[in-house]
Amino acid sequence: DDLKLETWLNEYIWPLEAHLNGEYCYAGALLGCVEMIKSGTTTFNDMYFYMDHVAEAVKETGLRAVISHGMIDFDDEEKKKAEIKESKRIIKKCHGMADGRVKVALGPHSPYTCSRELLEEVRSLADEHGLFIHIHVAETKDEVRQVKEKYGERPFTYLDEIGFLGEDVIAAHAVWLSSSEIHLLKSRGVKLSHNPTSNMKLASGISPVNELINSGLCVSLGTDGAASNNNLDMIEEMKIAALSQKIKNMSPTALDAGTVFKMATINGAAALGMADEIGTIEANKKADLALINTKRSHLTPWRNPASHLVYAASGCDIETVICDGEILMENGKLKSLDEKYVIELAESAAEDLISKA
């Protein structure tokens, strides 16, 4: 906690991740799925390692997910080949798992950790297989500086020059953008994932979300990983997103409750190419529902649902969750998992991993 992104990654996260294995990732994924179900999330997009183990956790829990192997090569040709090979393995093994609830995307980490050649191969694979691309872009000022020094352009401009951008790209963060990049993103149909808590905790900055939405871009909402948040509560994330935009713009009207609620629901579905299936309650869509107990003191009187959900509620108010028509939690009790077992498994995995660091 309480570190700059570069220090956090280089000195803590990446060294610890060198000791990861599939069992650790499975335990962590199960724990994350429990937390998401209990706070009302039915669908998530995640980039990490050992993603076949993550897919298995998704299958067992009943959630829906878009997963991708996180690729980093730092201009190392052998590493690039290994990353592409692993991504292809995950595509073959996991795409369409769990009756279609698991889909695979491609996950190049970022423009500053991936070579141009890797990014170009990712674009070719996405075109060949019809897959989405999940990437982190313009998260910090230092990232923008590194990309400009190496390639002579800002991150999104560089990605466009190599033919990377498109409607199938989901770019996380997008904190440090120029006006020309915003116009570029709109013209290319790039989807964005706003992660306000993570960006503020790491002091990366505050994305110009109000301007992005007013420009017509599809901006969804995310928590980022639990290591930089430190929870996966999307209801809490809505409030933080709204309040951070109000202070950034010095305007109480910036990012109203209705808009931020759409970011957490239909915009997320649209970003993942699922707007015709989920994201709203409509006839012929999949039954993805989260039921909230409105008879709580902090939610009374119940007059403005969007306002209450964004500014007053929390994930703890969710009582029942349904994904793809299956009840995953009812009256606060998980149906698909033994919560005590998952917590014990994750705690044991964490202790074992830390002992190796």
PLM regions and their residue ranges:
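Active-site gating loops and adjacent loop-to-helix segments of metal-dependent hydrolytic enzymes
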Residues: 1-26, 61-76, 81-84, 141-168, ...
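Metal-coordinating catalytic core of metallo-dependent amide/deamination hydrolases
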Residues: 53-176, 180
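A structural motif
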Residues: 39-41, 63, 130, 189-190
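Divalent metal-coordination and catalytic microenvironments
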Residues: 40, 58, 106, 136, ...
